[in-house]
UniProtKB/Swiss-Prot annotation:
One of its GO terms (biological process) is translation. Disulfide bonds: none annotated. The gene is rpsG. GO terms for cellular component: small ribosomal subunit. GO terms for molecular function: rRNA binding; structural constituent of ribosome; tRNA binding. Pfam families: Ribosomal_S7. Transmembrane segments: none annotated. This is Small ribosomal subunit protein uS7. Belongs to the universal ribosomal protein uS7 family.
Amino acid sequence: MSRRHSAEKRQIIPDAKYGDVVLTKFMNSVMYEGKKSVAESIVYGAFDIIESRARVNPIEVFRAALDNVAPAIEVRSRRVGGATYQVPVEVRHERRQALAIRWLIQAARSRNDRTMVERLSAELLDAANNRGAAVKKREDTHRMAEANRAFSHYRW
């Protein structure tokens, strides 16, 4: 890690259809091997399915899913005198968003539907309704933090 400068944050351009910066970050995470057009077609296809099935604005479903998946607290390992403790710490906003995006995509990829469009739309709808693998991951993280609450005084 460099000691001179912290890397400057790049300006992310909002997506063309909905004008949302977070959605662009989501698409960039879905993207493989720089194929942004494929990632866009996957995300927009999933949004079309959400719109036709649930009859609601897909961007609202997306935001609700992100809010329901984003963790408020997580555990980090801290070594104290030969023992390693799992110390619960609060999660910064940027990391909350990044974790929520990562967990949603991982959960969608591990589903058993035929195409990624179907898997992603199903996972987003589930997460918006507080169900699904991504929400379970957040609950497991919170449960782990709650179980290790006794070590919270080791926070840094």
